[in-house]
Regions:
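Nucleotide-state-sensitive switch-loop elements of NTP-binding domains
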Residues: 1-35, 64-75
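Short hydrophobic alpha-helical runs that function as membrane-insertion/retention elements
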Residues: 9-12, 45-46, 126-131
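Fold-independent oxyanion-binding glycine-rich loops
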Residues: 13-15, 50, 103-104
Length: 220
C-alpha cells in the first residue's frame, strides 16, 4: 500500500551472521513494537520469520555452552524461550496493541518436531499451510489449523450460522479425504463420494487457497 514503507521497521539477520545475533532479533523487534503500542497507542503488527531459524540458533548456542540437549537437539529451555516472545502479544486498555504473526517452517514436514510442537502449545492458533495436489495450490489445511479465540468472533461479529457452515464444510472435506483413501485402495466410489471429491477441489481452490482474498460474509 502507498506509504506503507514509512510505517515499517525491519530487523534482519542473515545466515552469514553469527547465530547468537539471531537470538536478539525478536527482542529488538518487540521492544520497538512495545514503544509504539504503549507510548503511542498504536496498533502494531509484528512479523517474525523464520522462527525455525531462531530455534536452530538457540540449539547452536546452547550446544556451544555445553548444555544438555532435549528433544530433537533443542535446548530444554525452548518452550520458555518461545513463550517469552509470543506472550508479548497484548491488547492495551488505552487502545494500543501488539499482534504477532510468526512463520515456522517444518523440518521435513514433521509437525511433531520440538519447534512446531512447542509453538502449538503457546500460540492462540495457527494456520497450517501445505501443497494441495488436487488443486495445485498452497492451501490452509483445515484439519491442522486451529483458533482458540474463534468463539469470540463467530456468530458475534460474523453471521449467526458461521460455526455451522464451518463445521459442515470441514466435515464434507473430511469425507472427501476418506473417499480418496477408498479410491487409492481400489474400492468403488459411491455417488456421494464422487460429489465430495468435486466439492473438495472447489473448496480448496475457492476457499482454502492462500491466494484467495474475499470477505468472510462472501466466503460463508
Amino acid at each position: 500500500a502507498a506509504g506503507a514503507l514509512d510505517k515499517i521497521i525491519s530487523f534482519v539477520n542473515t545466515t552469514e551472521q553469527p547465530p547468537v545475533e539471531r537470538l536478539l532479533i525478536p527482542d529488538m523487534a518487540l521492544t520497538a513494537a512495545e514503544y509504539f503500542a504503549v507510548e503511542k497507542n498504536e496498533k502494531v503488527l509484528v512479523l517474525l520469520t523464520d522462527m525455525t531459524l531462531y530455534a536452530d540458533a538457540l540449539s547452536i548456542v546452547s550446544n556451544r555452552m555445553d548444555q544438555i540437549p532435549s528433544k530433537d537437539s533443542m535446548p530444554g529451555s525452548l518452550y520458555s524461550d518461545l513463550a517469552k516472545i509470543y506472550e508479548k502479544a497484548v491488547q492495551l486498555p488505552e487502545g494500543g496493541s501488539i499482534t504477532i504473526i510468526a512463520v515456522t517452517t517444518l523440518n521435513d514436514g514433521d509437525i511433531t518436531h520440538a519447534i512446531p510442537d512447542n509453538t502449538g502449545y503457546i500460540t492462540e492458533g495457527q494456520l497450517f499451510l501445505r501443497a494441495d495436489p488436487d488443486s495445485g495450490k498452497v492451501i490452509i489445511d483445515p484439519f491442522r489449523s486451529l483458533s482458540r479465540l474463534k468463539q469470540l468472533v463467530q456468530g458475534k461479529q460474523t453471521r449467526k450460522d458461521h460455526s455451522q457452515v464451518m463445521n459442515a464444510s470441514v466435515r464434507l472435506y473430511a469425507d472427501a479425504q476418506n473417499a480418496k483413501t477408498k479410491l487409492e485402495n481400489g474400492f468403488d466410489l459411491s455417488d456421494y463420494d464422487l460429489r465430495c471429491l468435486d466439492y473438495a477441489k472447489a473448496y480448496a481452490t475457492r476457499i482454502l487457497a492462500i491466494d484467495v482474498n474475499i470477505k468472510i460474509d462472501e466466503m460463508l
